[in-house]
């Protein structure tokens, strides 16, 4: 019952309050900077010193999030040295739920926590997972809702293209 109530509340918050912010985060818009609690201190979005930040909003009850984490691990490993930083923002109300998820689906990238959901509202998140690719200045390069392995090639291509553009004179 508690879980169903939490899901219903999150749905209302995500759809009701997030809609206006979604319009502000179209491609080319500057995303609001975030400073969130992480396991080893504060986590900044966009990530400090990163050429690109992949921001992923997730929750422990999100089925597609379980599929996206291994892919994000791959992207961090493959492109981290080139300047990509993956930041996954957990929106669970209970920290223990996120901890259980992370025991089952490990993350080799930064995890930030926002039980209030304020960051999701500011980024116009309407469902999970929702991912946003930001350049070093916080400009939105890509916004993607959901995750399926079939999405992976196009998402990776967007990361490659953005990194190549950053390197070009």
What are these regions (language model features)?
Residues 33-53:
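A short beta-strand-turn-helix
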Residues 18-24:
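Boundary at the C-terminal end of the N-terminal hydrophobic targeting segment
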Residues 66-105, 115-121, 157:
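Structural microenvironment flanking redox-active thiols in thiol-disulfide oxidoreductases
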Residues 8-18:
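Bacterial N-terminal signal peptides
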Residues 49, 100-108, 115-160:
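Thiol/disulfide oxidoreductase modules built on the thioredoxin-like
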Residues 1-4:
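Positively charged n-region of N-terminal signal peptides that target proteins for export
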Residues 51-53, 57-61, 127:
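Short pre-active-site segment immediately N-terminal to redox-active cysteine/selenocysteine motifs
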């Amino acid at each position: 019952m508690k879980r169903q109530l939490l899901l219903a509340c999150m749905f209302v918050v995500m759809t009701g309050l997030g809609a206006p912010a979604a319009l502000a985060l179209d491609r080319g818009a500057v995303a609001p900077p975030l400073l969130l609690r992480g396991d080893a201190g504060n986590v900044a979005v966009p990530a400090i010193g990163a050429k690109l930040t992949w921001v992923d909003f997730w929750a422990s009850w999100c089925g597609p999030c379980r599929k996206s984490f291994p892919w994000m691990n791959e992207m961090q490993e493959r492109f981290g040295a080139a300047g990509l930083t993956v930041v996954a923002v957990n929106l669970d109300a209970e920290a223990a739920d996120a901890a259980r998820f992370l025991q089952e689906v490990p993350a080799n990238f930064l995890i930030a926590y926002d039980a209030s959901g304020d960051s999701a509202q500011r980024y116009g998140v309407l469902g999970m997972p929702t991912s946003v690719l930001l350049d070093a200045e916080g400009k939105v390069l890509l916004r993607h809702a959901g995750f399926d392995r079939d999405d992976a090639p196009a998402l990776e291509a967007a990361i490659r293209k953005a990194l190549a553009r950053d390197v070009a004179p």
